[in-house]
Amino acid sequence: MILHCPVSLSLSFHLNLRTSRIGNIGVTRVNASQRNHSKKLTKNLRNPRRTKLPPDFGVNLFLRKPKIEPLVIDDDDEQVQESVNDDDDAVVWEPEEIEAISSLFQKRIPQKPDKPSRVRPLPLPQPHKLRPLGLPTPKKNIIRSPALSSVSKQVYKDPSFLIGLAREIKSLPSSDADVSLVLNKWVSFLRKGSLSTTIRELGHMGLPERALQTYHWAEKHSHLVPDNRILASTIQVLAKHHELKLLKFDNSLASKNVIEAMIKGCIEGGWLNLARKLILISKSNNRILDSSVYVKMILEIAKNPDKYHLVVALLEELKKREDLKLSQQDCTSIMKICVKLGEFELVESLFDWFKASNREPSVVMYTTMIHSRYSEQKYREAMSVVWEMEESNCLLDLPAYRVVIKLFVALDDLGRAMRYYSKLKEAGFSPTYDIYRDMISVYTASGRLTKCKEICKEVEDAGLRLDKDTSFRLLQLEKQTMSLLH
């Protein structure tokens, strides 16, 4: 049986090329000549692919009834098949059933319905953003450089400018000239509270009348009043110079800041009785004044030993305060006064309160605490403060060296006294007379005549003279030493 198999041109070309390489040179030359005359096909044309047909979405391809091609069946097989069909009950599809099943796949299978598209309502119009049509839209977020910023923002709170205003007012040609000649030029640059610095500076210059004129000028400008800061500064200046009668105002309606300024002005002006009366009136009216007012009053009254009883009363009042607010300087000043008055318990409580407020004590506060315990003759407790001061790496000043050396002399601790005396010189301080005297006394107690003579030489070089008591003790030590030698 001869089978005819058609072969494409490209396949025959490759077969001919392969056979030509084996042995037929003549055929190769013919093919080569033909290849030169005919254009070579590209690869995709030589081996074309069958294009993919798009799927038919009208009918489900998986449930389509397959097509059965007729096969050539022998007679014997046909007889066997017929016998089998006769024996078995074959399932026969009726036309109605076939039509019903095929109708299910004529259309695309419905998918899950999508959510209905939701139309969001427009936002309500905002009245503050509506602008009339035809106007240009203003620029937003404009960044201004410091050079282009308003001059008033740079001037109204500048201390040098405000103090300069006070100097210009002071330099007016005559006392009859009004302060408006200076202030009118800068009225657009001033704000509330600006002139309080100018008024205080006029008070330091001794010009209470000019301060009062400045306050009255500010009252005429609505953007500068009402302002308690200007009023408080004016009252403090007038009270300091005993000119409160020049200003008329209602004390009962005065604010806390105004009353505090009045008390401070009275204290600075020496009106201690008036200041004390104002404090008592405020207490009776259940007005709680700032702690700094009590501190200022205590420091001023403590200058007079005859009024120590008033200081004790104010200290008791200050002790009752739960919201105690003291600066480091005020706390140290109160501790020093308490040491003078012998109120050592109050010194201890103030020192503990200050450390409990998470603040580091200064060398002045440490020195005051050591002096307090030394005055109470609690030398060992005072030594603990010295170690605490050294652990805090606090640099000692001359008063601190004086108190520490005095403490070591009281403890008869010659070694530590000598060490701190050497540290004092290394720090560049010049010993005072009481330090020389304490060192001579501790050397005398230990019988160190040579060291005593060295200290006496330093005293002479410093241009000082020993007192009679110290000189007498040196003579006794010298006599004892001479008697031991003989």
UniProtKB/Swiss-Prot annotation:
Record-given protein name: Pentatricopeptide repeat-containing protein At2g01860
Species whose genome carries this gene: Arabidopsis thaliana (Mouse-ear cress)
Record's keyword terms, sorted: Repeat
Keyword Repeat set for record: yes
PPR repeat extents: 290-321, 327-361, 362-396, 397-431, 432-466
Transmembrane segments: none
Region (Disordered): 111-137
One Pfam family here: PPR_long
Highest taxon above the source species: Eukaryota
Recorded family membership: Belongs to the PPR family. P subfamily.
Keyword Glycoprotein listed: no
